[in-house]
Structures are given as C-alpha cells and as structure tokens.
C-alpha cells in the first residue's frame, strides 16, 4: 500500500482491509498527500483516533469514516423522515449489530491445530481479547444522525453490560479440543447512552447467537 499511496495520479485512498490495517494505511496515505475513506472501525484505540484527527488537520486532507449503514436506502429514508418531523421529537432510539457469524468463524480460525491466540485470524483474536461493543457504528451511526449528535446534542453518559461468553468459549473448545478460559467478548453486549438534551439510545452487539 505504501507504493500506491506515493503515486501522484491518486487523490483518495479507499481502505477496506482488516481492522488492524485501517489506521496505518490511513496515516501513511495522509502523510503522502492523499484523502482517505476508511471502512469501520477507522482506528483501534483513542490514541489512533486523535492521531487521525490531528493528521487530517495538519495535512488538510479529508479523513472520512465509511459507515455504510448510514447511507443505505432504509437509513437515508428514515433520516429524511426524522428531519421532516414525521416522528415528532425523538426521545429514545435503538440500534444494533446483531449478526451471527457462525458460518464465518471457520474462516476466522487461522490455525485449527491449537489454541494459540497468536495464530488466530484477526477477527477471532480481537473478539477473544477485547470486551464490550467492538463494532458499534452500524447501529449507532444512523441513530446519531437522527438525533443530531454533534449538531446540537451530544452524548454525556454511557453504561454497558454484557453476558458471559458462553458460545464463544464453547466454539473455541470445539475447534481446538482445549478448554477456553479467556474469551473477553461476551455473547451479547447492551449499551445505554444519554445525551445532553435528555435523549436515550440503546445499542446492542451480538455476533455469537442466532436471532429470530
């Protein structure tokens, strides 16, 4: 990607790699004078977030988060209705990323011979090592637009709770033949947020259990 970012005939770099490469590719692209459009998540921690913000301001290059769920037909239609006052004053909203990845976990298991986390595919590894809603913007993005977040309102309070990892641990055990003692991401995570104007948002994350 470095050779591509250095080319003089390219204005924008569209980044749709694995999560771990979103930040370094975006950083290198802006350092070489390119606008960036990044699939979510655009960064993996707060330091990376601020680095992208500061670099975008310093280089005067756009750094755009491509949260596709903000721009599908259904979401754009709902946003237009909200802005036209069809729903009145929205005081509570829900969003979620509920996507059972049971059919995909085999592809996310890099080394089926053992349970060495260093040999895992990046997505399985991230779910095993990190707790909380690790993919919030599919649900939060459209909701934030409808509630005018950072356009007159802002989130002030957040609390999150998760279930134990039941399916995750069982899946690793069945795949590796060994007990899985550490799987930090719960099967289901629920997050409640309150805004400065008293609105409430509920966000859910679940990639482990089937839903009706």
Residue ranges and their predicted role:
Residues 1-11:
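A structured beta-alpha segment of the ubiquitous adenosine-cofactor-binding alpha/beta core
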Residues 10, 19, 99, 164, ...:
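Flexible, active-site-proximal loop/turn residues at the rims of small-molecule/cofactor binding pockets
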Residues 11-12, 92:
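Short, Asp-centered acidic motifs that coordinate Mg2+ and/or phosphate
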Residues 12, 18-19, 23-71, 85:
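Beta-strand-loop-alpha-helix segment that lines the small-molecule cofactor/substrate pocket
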Residues 59-62, 69-183:
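Predominantly a Rossmann-like dinucleotide-binding segment in NAD(P)-dependent oxidoreductases
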Residues 180-189, 193-212:
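NAD(P)-dinucleotide binding in Rossmann-like oxidoreductases
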